A protein has these predicted regions:
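Fungal secretory targeting signals
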Residues: 1-21, 352
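Primary mode marks residue(s) on the alpha4-beta5-alpha5 output face of response regulator receiver
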Residues: 19-45, 50-198, 205-352
């Protein structure tokens, strides 16, 4: 739904003239305070996350385990994608100082998904080398939770929707120009929700499946340039999209001064600290085959599915109804949908 407005950004970043896109839904697996990438083994972790993907998600996510082989179900459309994707959670702060979790809206043409995210894997045509799919044990982090100002080489893109209709067509038209996108949380009331897209790096050093900071083994190329010599291997452009249902929180609940009332679970009211984690978990070599074939899959249509094998014969799909049945109970058990006196974990709100 939004991908064409982001194509220019991806093209410039990857210096490509044509790209191919896998776009699919991943409904909610669980929402809880666990972060096995940044805080492995810690229960609970400092702030709340929304998690989608395979049911092998756990407190530690031991990198020696191939989660593509250990997971038994996934919330994603592609039934061989047992990867896990997670981001911070958006909260509304009312004028009386209490907080409530903002739910997600399923994406256009993916409306059967129960909240969650839309996931994109993008590969260009005119690349100097093949696109190398990730390997078991690979993981990475995009963004920095502590940021309150723009981060060099990384952006989130936000869009404020005025409304949407019964067919989940959003206004303003998400296929339009990216001029309405911002790199910080919108400051106005968004009756159709707030969309946020988070982009992962596209270059890898070809050696390390992870590094202590979960970033140094990957890199963003300079705009219009190929991958740097330090990270010469081109990997798929992964980005994830969430639409937060901000319409439920009308202006009567906003702070009396009209200031922006939304804050991410790590205490970020700016949006610059929004971040995402990725742990690879595709089964077998399906993702590599899809990259080699430059598969294009944009929509998950109502059942029966009309893409794959036509869209990408190398990948297997499942109905969204089946995907929605894959879920986990909270390990770090705490309330999700009540009004709270503080952000989960008593995370302080910081502006710098």
């Amino acid at each position: 739904m939004l991908w064409s407005s982001l194509i220019a950004l991806v093209l410039v970043a990857r210096n490509a003239e044509a790209i191919h896109t896998l776009r699919f839904a991943c409904s909610q697996l669980v929402t809880e305070r666990l972060d096995p990438l940044v805080n492995p083994g810690k229960n609970p972790s400092p702030h709340m996350h929304q998690i989608v993907g395979g049911n092998a998600f756990n407190t530690t996510m031991d990198p020696s385990n191939d989660i593509g082989e250990t997971a038994t179900c996934t919330t994603c459309t592609f039934s061989e994608d047992f990867s896990n994707y997670w981001t911070a959670v958006l909260y509304f702060r009312a004028r009386n100082g209490t907080f409530k979790r903002v739910p997600q809206i399923a994406n256009q043409n993916l409306a059967q998904a129960e909240g969650g995210m839309t996931v994109y894997y993008i590969s260009p045509d005119n690349t100097t080398s093949p696109i190398t799919a990730f390997r078991p044990g690979f993981r990475m982090l995009a963004g920095t939770a502590e940021n309150r100002k723009p981060e060099s080489g990384f952006v989130n893109l936000y869009r404020c929707y005025d409304s949407y209709d019964e067919n989940m067509f959003f206004k303003p038209n998400p296929m339009g120009i990216a001029a309405t996108d911002t790199t910080e949380l919108p400051k106005s009331f968004c009756g159709g929700g707030i969309r946020v897209n988070t982009f992962f790096p596209t270059c890898w050093n070809g050696v390390d499946l992870d590094t202590p900071d979960h970033k140094s083994h990957v890199a963003y190329p300079d705009r219009g340039a190929p991958c740097p010599a330090t990270h010469p291997v081109e990997i798929p452009q992964v980005f994830i999209e969430t639409i937060w249902d901000t319409e439920k929180f009308d202006k009567s609940l906003w702070p009396e001064d009209g200031s922006q009332p939304f804050v991410f679970s790590q205490g970020d009211p700016t949006g610059y600290g929004h971040h995402a984690d990725y742990v690879f978990g595709w089964k077998g070599d399906g993702l590599q085959k899809a990259m080699d074939a430059r598969c294009d899959v944009y929509d998950a249509s109502p059942e029966p599915l009309i893409f794959p094998p036509e869209g990408c014969p190398h990948l297997k799909t499942q109905s969204q109804k089946v995907a929605n049945q894959c879920s986990q109970r909270q390990v770090a058990v705490e309330p999700l949908d009540e009004w709270l006196d503080a952000l989960p974990g008593n995370m302080p709100i910081t502006y710098s």
